[in-house]
């Protein structure tokens, strides 16, 4: 795909906003549905609904924000990977450090959603 080194940087809490996954749904509905459903089953609440319809006050709650941002990061990573992108470097800010470590070195995204 690219001949130059590419870095992927994952965001932390504070990057959330209502409708934050809409651009991903438009590009890869199947991928979004699969990962949003997995996250929802693990967490016990509808992650897709919260990402698309949740208000700013809902998304400020850490218990909502961090799993939602992580799930969107997983979907973004999978979409980039599907398109052939293989980054040379990954990094993250705050919560994004977990995303970077886990997604770059493992396929166990479910594990991080279970951390209490």
Where are these regions (language model features)?
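Helix-rich "cap/lid" substructures immediately adjacent to catalytic or cofactor-binding pockets
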Residues: 2-91
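Gly/Ala-rich beta-loop-alpha elbow adjacent to hydrolase catalytic centers
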Residues: 92, 96, 100
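Conserved small/polar residues in nucleotide/adenosyl-binding loops
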Residues: 104-109
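Structured catalytic cores of enzymes that bind and process phosphorylated ligands/cofactors
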Residues: 71-72, 100-102
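Short stretches within intrinsically disordered, low-complexity N-terminal or propeptide regions
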Residues: 9, 110-111
């Amino acid at each position: 795909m690219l001949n130059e080194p590419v870095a992927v940087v994952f965001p932390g809490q504070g990057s959330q906003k209502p409708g934050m996954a809409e651009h991903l749904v438009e590009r890869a509905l199947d991928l979004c549905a699969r990962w949003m459903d997995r996250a929802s089953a693990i967490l016990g609440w509808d992650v897709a609904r919260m990402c698309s319809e949740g208000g700013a006050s809902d998304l400020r709650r850490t218990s909502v924000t961090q799993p939602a941002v992580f799930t969107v990061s997983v979907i973004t990573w999978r979409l980039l990977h599907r398109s052939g992108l293989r980054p040379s470097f990954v990094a993250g800010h705050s919560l994004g450090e977990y995303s970077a470590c886990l997604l770059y070195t493992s396929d166990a995204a479910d594990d991080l959603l279970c951390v209490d």
